[in-house]
């Protein structure tokens, strides 16, 4: 009976795999290879989500996640983060995400935090506190809003991408610099634009350049992250993304560092990760990880994490430190 209930819960809560189809989404199709890659990523995310929704406990989901193809496993952990956060946000939900992060999911902590943001996009706002309770890292919590922004751009593309909607007075996190929330959401929208544009750098850049100039730095950062972590682009296309970004190429590189660091931490570095990190950032994935770690430590040492509406969170200082660190590498003899 219990297994029947878990299967029913999975059927009720899990979106159809068709939701990852580029044609269903109305996304640009660059070529069959890119389409296959992007759709496989979406399907793997939904698989991880389903594992979490159906699991008796996080350890059971972890065992199944570890059996998935390694190069896509990070997306499955992201989906599982969403699934467990949805369960935490429901009545009598529990603390599934916290328990999940005590295992192998800690290697994918960036992805799990992003998954929490997906869950928030699906839950009523009065459930957000429960769903996001495990996002206790004061720096990484902004990745939750990155996930929220990705979800909105992926599933509500016309409103958030083509009509460039921006949510006013975003209420989460309650104790963070209020004005920064929209920037973190834009970083997620930029990540989604890589998918909306079918991993075509010209299409992605055209979509980003249609936004107000004040938003483009964060959007290009997200695109750089997706181009490095998700891929589906060759060397010439990665160079085209950097060229089209123009003055925002440092932000593309910063996003690439985040992606390289995330894959290196999880032990999921692919040949594409190395290629993209080198072309967009000028570093190896291991160097990206080292730079991310040292930059975060420096940011935390100089930030009091002000809570006022005009404050700059440590997360943003971290991103700026990465940009300056890359600049120093370029000028070093």
Task: For each feature predicted by the language model, list its residue ranges.
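Mature, well-folded catalytic/scaffold domains that follow N-terminal targeting or propeptide regions
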Residues: 1-333
């Amino acid at each position: 009976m219990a297994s029947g209930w878990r299967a029913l819960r999975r059927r009720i809560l899990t979106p159809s795999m068709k939701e990852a189809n580029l044609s269903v989404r109305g996304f640009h199709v660059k070529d069959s290879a890119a389409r296959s890659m992007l759709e496989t990523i979406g399907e793997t995310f939904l698989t991880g989500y389903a594992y979490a929704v159906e699991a008796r406990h996080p350890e059971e989901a972890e065992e199944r996640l570890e059996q998935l193809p390694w190069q896509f496993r990070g997306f499955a952990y992201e989906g599982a983060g969403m699934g467990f956060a949805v369960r935490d946000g429901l009545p009598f939900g529990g603390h599934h995400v916290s328990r999940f992060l005590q295992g192998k999911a800690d290697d994918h902590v960036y992805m799990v935090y992003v998954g929490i943001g997906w869950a928030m996009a699906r839950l009523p706002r009065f459930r957000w506190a429960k769903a996001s309770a495990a996002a206790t890292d004061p720096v990484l919590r902004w990745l939750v809003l990155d996930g929220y922004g990705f979800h909105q751009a992926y599933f509500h593309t016309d409103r958030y991408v083509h009509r460039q909607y921006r949510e006013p007075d975003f209420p989460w996190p309650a104790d963070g610099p209020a004005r920064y929330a929209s920037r973190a959401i834009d970083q997620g929208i930029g990540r989604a634009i890589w998918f909306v544009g079918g991993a075509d750098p010209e299409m992605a850049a055209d979509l980003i350049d249609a936004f107000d100039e004040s938003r483009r730095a964060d959007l290009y950062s997200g695109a750089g992250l997706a181009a490095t972590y998700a891929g589906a682009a060759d060397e010439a296309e990665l160079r085209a993304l950097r060229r089209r970004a123009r003055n925002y190429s440092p932000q593309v590189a910063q996003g690439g560092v985040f992606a390289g660091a995330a894959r290196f931490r999880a032990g999921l570095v692919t040949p594409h990760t190395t290629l993209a990190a080198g072309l967009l950032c000028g570093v190896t994935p291991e160097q990206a990880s080292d730079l991310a770690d040292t930059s975060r430590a420096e940011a935390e040492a100089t930030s009091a994490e002000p809570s006022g509406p005009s404050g700059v969170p440590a997360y943003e200082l971290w991103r700026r430190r990465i940009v300056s660190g890359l600049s120093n590498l370029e000028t070093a003899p």
